């Protein structure tokens, strides 16, 4: 399949995708309720989409094309409320979080779709281990070349996005020590990591065709990059976030990405360069391991500071962009979270320490999602 042309889209519009956990109310383990929930929701009126994922223990909700933070918040809230209402008759719980705290990957089944069955056949057990839950944010770009500029410019802020959304401290009943253990599952795939440093669509098309001719990939879907262009939508897709525990935080993070994109496209505070990636993997690891307490190394100045402080250092520059986009409340929430340094991973650990029961932790995560 050749690379399709980059579709024209309205700059700085955005969309949000959230992968959610489906658990039974008996022991709060993952359960394959997606087909039942989708049947219960058939005919429900809402913007956006609700659809199955790689495992029937997951479900994805996504907004339409959003122009504002408030629109995204309203669309996701409506879908959340519809799903929560439908879940009651199914004795089903729905939760955010990047990983389920104690599910066993070997118990999972793969959804019966050609794409997911292909992934299972190609990647073996990695497909079942990929029962993790992420937030993806699409940002509309004014042109194909601008999409690549934005992809690499916003790459500097990947540690922000990871740390702000981190909600996966537990894997198979064990505290991993990570704030976001989910990304370790993604890293096992061969085409994961960061996109190649290319700044023109002609160069990117040549790269894509070369990779396709090797047989390594067939389409853009085979790239599991942290940020990837989506030519069929005219967007870039930021893919590093765990699914937060609440719709509110998911929308705050999406709005933060949108305002950063506006700042980078209009102000051009720097030009991306290959050397930006010298510290990329280190910064990303710090965000995964330590969350907002992790260290951020500036790629040019080589100074070090906590990720939370680096977030706070950019907030003032984002104020006019947040104001123009109608997302000042989201910026205030992001600033407050960075000041507190107590994200969702911290909340999950605190609940687990008090309850001494991961089942109870999942139950309370379901309550958080429904609130």
Swiss-Prot record:
It comes from the Bacteria. InterPro entries: GCL_type2/YbdK_subfam, GCS2, Gln_synth/guanido_kin_cat_dom, YbdK. Disulfide bonds: none annotated. It catalyses: L-cysteine + L-glutamate + ATP = gamma-L-glutamyl-L-cysteine + ADP + phosphate + H(+). GO terms for biological process: modified amino acid biosynthetic process. Keywords: ATP-binding, Ligase, Nucleotide-binding. Its EC number is 6.3.2.2. It is an enzyme of class 6 (ligase). GO terms for molecular function: ATP binding; glutamate-cysteine ligase activity. Belongs to the glutamate--cysteine ligase type 2 family. YbdK subfamily. ATP-dependent carboxylate-amine ligase which exhibits weak glutamate--cysteine ligase activity. This is Putative glutamate--cysteine ligase 2. It comes from Cupriavidus taiwanensis (strain DSM 17343 / BCRC 17206 / CCUG 44338 / CIP 107171 / LMG 19424 / R1).
């Amino acid at each position: 399949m050749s690379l399709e042309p980059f579709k024209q889209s309205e700059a700085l519009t955005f969309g949000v995708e959230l992968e959610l956990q489906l658990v039974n109310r008996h022991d709060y383990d993952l359960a394959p309720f997606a087909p039942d929930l989708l049947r219960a929701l058939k005919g429900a009126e809402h913007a956006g989409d609700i659809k199955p994922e790689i495992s029937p223990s997951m479900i994805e909700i996504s907004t339409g094309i959003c122009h504002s933070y408030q629109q995204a918040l309203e669309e996701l809230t409506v879908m959340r409320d519809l799903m929560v209402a439908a879940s009651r008759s199914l004795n089903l719980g729905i939760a955010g979080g990047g990983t389920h705290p104690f599910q066993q990957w070997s118990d999972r089944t793969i959804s019966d779709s050609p794409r997911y069955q292909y992934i299972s056949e190609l990647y073996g057990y990695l497909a079942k281990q990929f029962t993790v839950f992420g937030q993806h944010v699409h940002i509309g770009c004014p042109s194909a070349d601008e999409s690549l500029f934005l992809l690499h410019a916003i790459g500097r802020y990947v540690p922000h996005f990871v740390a702000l959304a981190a909600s996966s401290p537990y894997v198979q009943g064990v505290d991993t020590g990570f704030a976001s253990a989910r990304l370790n599952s993604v890293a096992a795939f061969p085409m994961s990591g960061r996109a190649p440093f290319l700044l023109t669509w002609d160069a990117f098309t040549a790269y894509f065709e070369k990779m396709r001719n090797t047989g390594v990939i067939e389409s853009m879907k085979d790239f599991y990059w942290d940020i990837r262009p989506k030519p069929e939508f005219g967007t870039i897709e930021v893919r590093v976030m765990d699914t937060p525990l609440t719709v509110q935080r998911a929308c705050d993070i999406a709005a933060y990405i949108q305002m950063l994109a506006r700042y980078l496209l209009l102000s051009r505070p720097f030009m991306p360069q290959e050397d930006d990636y010298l510290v990329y993997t280190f910064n990303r690891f710090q965000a995964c391991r330590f969350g907002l307490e992790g260290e951020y190394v500036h790629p040019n100045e080589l100074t070090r500071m906590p990720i939370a402080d680096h977030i706070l250092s950019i907030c003032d520059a984002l104020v006019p962009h947040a104001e123009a986009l109608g997302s000042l409340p989201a910026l205030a929430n992001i600033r407050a979270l960075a000041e507190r340094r107590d994200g969702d991973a911290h909340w999950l650990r605190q609940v687990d320490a008090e309850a001494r029961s991961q089942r109870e932790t999942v139950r309370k995560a379901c309550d958080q999602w429904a609130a």
